[in-house]
Amino acid sequence: MTGPRPTTVFLVRHGLPTSGEHIDPPLSETGQAQAALLGAWLVHEQPVAVYASDYRRAWQTAAPLARLLGLEVQQRKGLREWASSRTHYVRPEDLAHTPEGRAFAEGRFEDFVPDHDRVALRATMVGELRGIGDRHPGQTVAVVSHGGALNTLLASAVGSERPFFFNPGYAAVSRMQVWPDGRLVVASVNETAHLAPQRLRAFLTNDKAATE
């Protein structure tokens, strides 16, 4: 007799967005290429559902994969990034000359994280993942969210109190198992093989043979 099987969740940070326009920017050209490469790679895992936050940079990242699978992207507010007082989106790398940008570059992530309700964000992200596990027992699912939100989730799973302990790449993938008893088990963090520079360059120059 086989025992209970976990739900396998591919956790994805959104692709590279534009910056400085408004609070909910779309993907940049590079971000669109990252999303396409992600979809071409992850489709072989045959997710039965594709979830994303309702911010454009997240659901646009999920869209190519969903298209290849013949699925709709299920948008969830609970997968949003942490709240911020900013009125427009700024990519971390565009803050290089600010104190918080220097903290980010030096790996002092605690000094980069904005003041927000960390307990609430952690509870929301853990609740979202457990809900996905309940809806898709023993199946495979893809989830596109945000760097801070994913850090919070992964930190909870490994028992870390730090709200931001690594810098996930754009369109990078981490793998998590959601067990029927609610346990969250991290299987991998920050996979980027599908985003090899030569593949990204080839996609941007329409050399499709080199992306295969």
Model-predicted regions and their roles:
Residues 4-75:
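Active-site-proximal alpha-helix that buttresses catalytic centers in soluble enzyme cores
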Residues 17, 149-150:
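Short active-site segment of divalent metal-dependent hydrolases/proteases
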